[in-house]
Structures are given as C-alpha cells and as structure tokens.
C-alpha cells in the first residue's frame, strides 16, 4: 500500500505498478538484452517497445487518473523503442570518484534519422526503480514519453546517482552530482544515437519538482560548457532549496504536503554522504526518529507509519530558529543548493501552480524575478502559472504547454 507521495510518486511503500496499458514489452532476444557497447564505456540495451495504443492510453486514461487532472494532450502518432543506457560518470564532490550510472533513451519509430531531443529530469521518488530507465514504474516518465517521444521527439532521462541500478547511496539534491549525471547521460546518449546513425540538431530540457531543480542546474552546466540549448522548461521547480525548506519551518501553510518531512530526510543523509560531513543527519534529526529516517534513506525495511509528518517531531527544535538554521552545517550546504543565480542565456519557462502543496508561487517565480532584477533585466526566463493546480496537477498541466512551446522553436 502506498502511504504517502513525493512529487506525486511512491514515497513509503512498494514500487508503483505499471500504468494500465503502459507495460514494457520485454526485449525480444537474448542479444538485445545483453546490450551493445559503444564509445568504450557506454552500453545500451533494448528494454521494451510501447505502441501507439499504449501511448494514447497513458495520455487519455492513466495520466488523468494518476495526476488528478484532465488535460488535453496531443495524441501519439508513432510507437517508441525504449533503451536503458549505462555509462561512466564521476562524483564531483568526492574528487571525481568514478562510478557507473544509468538512464533511459526513447527512440520514435518513424523512419526519420533526425529528431528534436528532450532531456527529461525526474522528480523525487522513494523506490530506486521509479526512475526513467524503469519507465513502467514511473508515471511521470511515461507521460513524457507518450507526449514527446510519441510525437517524434527523442527522449532521454538520467536516473541520478544512487537510483536505477546504481549501487551508490542516493545523491538527493546534491547539485554538482546532478549536473554530472545529466551531462554525462547526454554525452552517452549522443554516442548511442551516433551508433544508431541518428542525429538530434535541437536540444530541449525539462523537469518536474526535484527534476525542475536538476533541469536548471543542468542548464547552468550546459551553458558553461557552451552546449546550445534550444529551450528549457520546468514545473514546480525548487530553484532555491534553502528558501524552499526554510519556508516549511518558518512560514508553514495550511496546504503544505504531509510528505515534506521526507525532503529533510533525503537531503540530510545525501549531503552527509556526498559532501562527507559525518553526523550531519544526526545533528538535524531528533534521536527518536533518526534510526527510522536512516532506514528510509537506505531503503532498509521499516514501518512507514513510524516516519512523522510533523516536522516538530522529526527535526531538532533549534532548527526552527531561522538564524540557527542558516548558520548550521546543513543550512550552509542548503544555501549553496540553488539553480538560478547566473546570467541565463537560453529561453526558459518555469511553470508553477497557485495551490501547489510543495512549491509556493514565490519559489515558482524566483528565477524570473532574479534575472529581471539585474539592471534593465534579463528577459530570458518567464514564469508561467498553471492556475489552481496541485503539485501533480502542475506537471500534468504544464507538459502539453512545454510541447507547444518546444514545437514553436
């Protein structure tokens, strides 16, 4: 039984079942399952094929049911082949320690050889396999595949470090690692596409919630590396994690989600592991709930009912003092976890919901406000309201708007 949700996906409980009509067709041959190696350290394997009927089932039935809103999506026109890509990467926070990561590549079956490419960055999930390269367990990825790959876009998505088939601990909201995972996934995917004799002249990037933050951080890295980005779009993006989390402590709202406690759990243990700050999570969490929080982060067996939804039970009382929070080791790391404080050059649209239970309208508009605050203002970033939408509803409503905007580029 799924007990709560992060980014609308399973948080505490078993992995979600595949959406109806969206199950992955197993790879047909042993050779396909074994995979193909390209560029020395990049491997890809066929994991399934979704036909037009399945893609349209996702758009017309599965997604409205899961996200809780009825949205008019553009019907799928073509089937899609799905591949898991395995690639070499490094952890920047640990002296570029080498690791292996995974992600998804979705290829439209149209007979064409050139396609626009969307890199989709997924939101927060509890299950290690509720990520792009296990698309039958990821309703948000399924929606992106159906709307974009089913309409002739190549689609890629990194699983992030510690997710998918990775043996690493989760690197939740660890900025440089998210940048590395997505950048290396793009490079690996381009190697796979070259092997398939396919090209992608236009690059789009998009993501929801945590994935919205990752999308903006990815954009920062791409612009720094001189990689052209045709356009970037997010939904419910916490572009300033310190402002987002401190808001739950200092200015709680009546509609704040009951799964917010998990954001503190995942980030504190991830920061402790990736930034190598022993005792960071223990300093933040109350002794009564430290052990169950650690088990939740490490995906060990535990009773989900033991994780409190009341932040006053989970967090030590001194963290509700804004000055203490900001000056703590955890707070200082959070203050550096932002993805909007540079002069953005690429066209960006940040979609936000007026009644989102996790991301306030102020956070949703923050990147635009910052860019326009500089002198005469940088107009590259636009914040777009999706109306009175929930966290899930904001993403579901934004996706077809992303599509129309990307198509115009």
PLM region spans:
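Accessory cap/linker subdomain of secreted extracellular hydrolases
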Residues: 56, 238-341
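Primarily recognizes the serine-hydrolase "nucleophile elbow" in alpha/beta-hydrolase
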Residues: 187-258
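Catalytic-loop region of hydrolases
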Residues: 22-113
